[in-house]
């Protein structure tokens, strides 16, 4: 290992939880191109049953998943004293969900994911992690 490589910081880690494999794979590919390390899970249960979750700078979680919603998953993470920033991706946010997310300091990015809205939110979250 060279002295220069010792100074290189590890990339920020983003965890994606989405039941749609096309969305999950697309997000992972895009974020890896942006320089993030990515771990992805098919649903809330898969993430919660993964054992030690390891370090993470940001969670990107789909709201509508079978078994447990994104907000419920974030609630489970908070109950485990995991305060890592979370971004909720959702097709049709309503006022009640938006208010709950704002109160819990959870960012919402609306689907379809256009331009760099999600990447910008992830950058912001990683700066505050």
Predicted regions and their residues:
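Non-catalytic signal-transmission and effector/linker regions of two-component phosphorelay proteins
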Residues: 1-15, 21-22, 114-129
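Two-component/phosphorelay signaling modules centered on CheY-like receiver
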Residues: 21-39
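Acidic, metal-coordinating helix/loop segments flanking the phosphotransfer/catalytic sites
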Residues: 40-58
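Acidic catalytic/metal-coordinating carboxylates
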Residues: 42-43, 69-72
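Active-site residues of response regulator receiver
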Residues: 62
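Receiver (REC) domain active-site loop signature in two-component systems and cognate sites
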Residues: 65
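Short amphipathic alpha-helix used as the core "switch/output" element in two-component signaling
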Residues: 71-82
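Hydrophobic/aromatic residues positioned on beta-strands within the core alpha/beta folds
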Residues: 89-91
């Amino acid at each position: 290992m060279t002295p220069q490589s010792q100074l290189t910081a590890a990339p920020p880690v983003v965890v994606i939880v989405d039941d749609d494999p096309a969305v999950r794979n697309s997000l992972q590919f895009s974020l890896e191109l942006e320089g993030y390390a990515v771990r992805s899970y098919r649903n809330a249960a898969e993430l919660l049953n993964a054992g030690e979750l390891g370090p993470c700078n940001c969670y990107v979680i789909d709201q509508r998943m079978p078994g447990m919603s994104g907000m419920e998953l974030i609630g489970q993470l908070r109950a485990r004293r995991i305060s890592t920033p979370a971004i909720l991706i959702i097709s049709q946010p309503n006022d009640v969900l938006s208010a709950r997310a704002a109160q819990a300091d959870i960012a919402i990015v609306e689907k379809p994911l256009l331009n760099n809205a999600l990447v910008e939110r992830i950058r912001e979250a990683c700066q505050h992690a």
